[in-house]
Swiss-Prot record:
GO terms for molecular function: structural constituent of ribosome. GO terms for biological process: translation. SUPFAM superfamilies: Zn-binding ribosomal proteins. GO terms for cellular component: cytoplasm; ribonucleoprotein complex; ribosome. PROSITE patterns: RIBOSOMAL_L33. Belongs to the bacterial ribosomal protein bL33 family. It comes from Mycolicibacterium smegmatis (strain ATCC 700084 / mc(2)155) (Mycobacterium smegmatis). Pfam families: Ribosomal_L33. This is Large ribosomal subunit protein bL33A. Keywords: Ribonucleoprotein, Ribosomal protein. InterPro entries: Ribosomal_bL33, Ribosomal_bL33_CS, Ribosomal_bL33_sf, Ribosomal_zn-bd.
Length: 55
């Protein structure tokens, strides 16, 4: 069972423009303690948009 202090927790990436949650990924809390922001393709917008970590 995953604990809340997991080193690699699952995170959801949401589009900044349309706010749809399009991607699920893992991140390392030790290397990236802040919220993650990646530019990825949004199928709802049809273009590449910045996606931010949502909780």
């Amino acid at each position: 069972m995953a604990s809340s202090t997991d080193v690699r927790p699952k995170i959801t990436l949401a589009c900044e423009v349309c706010k749809h949650r399009n991607y699920i990924t893992k991140k390392n809390r030790r290397n990236d303690p802040d919220r993650l922001e990646i530019k990825k393709f949004c199928p709802n917008c049809g273009t590449h948009q910045p996606h931010k970590e949502s909780r």
